[in-house]
């Protein structure tokens, strides 16, 4: 049996903060909520599941892991989920997206990858940042449906390692 999935695109800073944006004046999470309503309708018509990537971004911002407004500078200690165009995801944003998709498709706790997992390392994400993003992904997935808490089941190396030998 084939299972269809839709993932929600996250809120776009370029549609919230500049005066020309469609959601100008709205809180950043409002765009995510509005987009979710549309995805839920499409998913229902296609008998598909929605993967909560946009909600995970909103959670990262509301919990202080990520900055809400890249146009006013990034607050110290917070991650910028957008790249330079404030539309597409940064490395952090795409890593969070991948964690949410991984957990949604497999039903596994994203924290089971461990903070030294090779993808985060190869992307230049620190172990502390990996841990925070894995926690956000887990918290969002837990809120949306059943996921078994199972942090770090893989052997943990002393330090991060590359994904494949060269």
Language model features: what each stretch is:
Residues 4-6, 56-57:
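Short glycine-enriched loops at secondary-structure junctions
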Residues 9-55, 77-78, 82-95:
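Substrate-gating cap/lid alpha-helix
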Residues 64-66:
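Short helix-loop boundary/capping segments
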């Amino acid at each position: 049996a084939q299972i269809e999935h839709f993932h929600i695109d996250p809120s776009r800073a370029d549609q919230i903060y500049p005066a020309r944006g469609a959601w100008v004046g709205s809180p950043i999470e409002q765009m995510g909520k509005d987009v979710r309503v549309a995805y839920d309708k499409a998913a229902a018509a296609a008998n598909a599941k929605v993967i909560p990537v946009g909600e995970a971004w909103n959670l990262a911002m509301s919990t202080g892991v990520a900055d809400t407004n890249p146009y006013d500078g990034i607050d110290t200690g917070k991650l910028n989920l957008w790249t330079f165009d404030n539309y597409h995801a940064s490395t952090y944003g795409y890593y969070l997206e991948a964690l949410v998709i991984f957990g949604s498709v497999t039903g596994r706790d994203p924290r089971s990858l461990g903070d030294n997992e090779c993808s985060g390392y190869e992307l230049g994400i620190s172990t502390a940042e990996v841990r925070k993003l894995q926690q956000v992904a887990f918290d969002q997935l837990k809120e949306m449906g059943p996921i078994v808490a199972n942090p770090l089941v893989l052997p943990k190396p002393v330090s991060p390692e590359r994904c494949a030998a060269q």
